[in-house]
């Protein structure tokens, strides 16, 4: 077993994934509450995608020696990062090509059985407009930085997918 595979089978790798998602969520709340930047609906959906990555990291951390746990974590990681990238690209398009016919809604469209914007309004209630660009760093908007972040998550997943799916030296169907 290579060092890379051992790392993919360790809690440390999943802890790094979880920690990076926590850092992004903390940054989002810093922008919202300290810098007073209002999140739009697409921003809220991207927050949810980051929470999905956080959940995937927690799943992987529970028992990373077992292949089934790593596969479930990787599946959550892939779905959340792909969905987040799709949302970030759509937001970049809205900001770069504003149109009165293509706008985002004022309220998120969560399922009726899970109205996150009502349960957690301080984190999941949008208050901004999607076409606003209130912040840039090095000439790159927040939406464009999220494209970088979600792309980074997908590149990391591509690097880790083979070691994640590989078994250990122990003879077992699940390891």
UniProtKB/Swiss-Prot annotation:
Membrane topology designation: Multi-pass membrane protein
Transmembrane segments: 14-30, 49-64, 72-89, 145-163
Any one GO molecular-function label of the UniProt entry: protein-disulfide reductase activity
Compartments it resides in: Cell inner membrane
Keywords: Cell inner membrane, Cell membrane, Chaperone, Disulfide bond, Electron transport, Membrane, Oxidoreductase, Redox-active center, Transmembrane, Transmembrane helix, Transport
GO cellular component: plasma membrane
Disulfide-bonded cysteines: 40-43, 104-130
Biological process, per Gene Ontology: protein folding
Chief localization: membrane
Ranges of the Cytoplasmic topological domain: 1-13, 65-71, 164-175
Intervals, Periplasmic compartment: 31-48, 90-144
HAMAP family, per the entry: DsbB
Protein family membership: Belongs to the DsbB family.
Function according to Swiss-Prot or TrEMBL: Required for disulfide bond formation in some periplasmic proteins. Acts by oxidizing the DsbA protein.
Listed name of the protein: Disulfide bond formation protein B
């Amino acid at each position: 077993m290579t060092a890379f595979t051992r790392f993919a089978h360790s809690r440390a790798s999943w802890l790094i994934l979880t920690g990076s998602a926590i850092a992004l969520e903390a940054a989002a709340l810093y922008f919202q509450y300290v810098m007073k930047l209002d999140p739009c609906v697409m921003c809220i959906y991207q927050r949810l995608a980051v929470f999905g990555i956080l959940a995937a990291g927690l799943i992987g951390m529970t028992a990373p020696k077992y292949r089934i746990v790593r596969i479930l974590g990787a599946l959550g990681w892939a779905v959340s990062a792909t969905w987040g990238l799709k949302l970030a690209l759509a937001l970049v398009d809205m900001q770069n090509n504003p149109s009165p016919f293509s706008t985002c809604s004022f309220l998120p469209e969560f399922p009726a059985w899970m109205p996150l914007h009502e349960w957690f309004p301080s984190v999941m209630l949008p208050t901004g407009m999607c076409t606003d660009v209130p912040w840039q760093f090095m000439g790159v908007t927040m939406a464009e930085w999220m494209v970088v972040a979600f792309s980074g998550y997908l590149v990391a997943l591509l690097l880790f997918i083979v070691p994640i799916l590989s078994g250990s030296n122990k003879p077992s169907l699940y390891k």
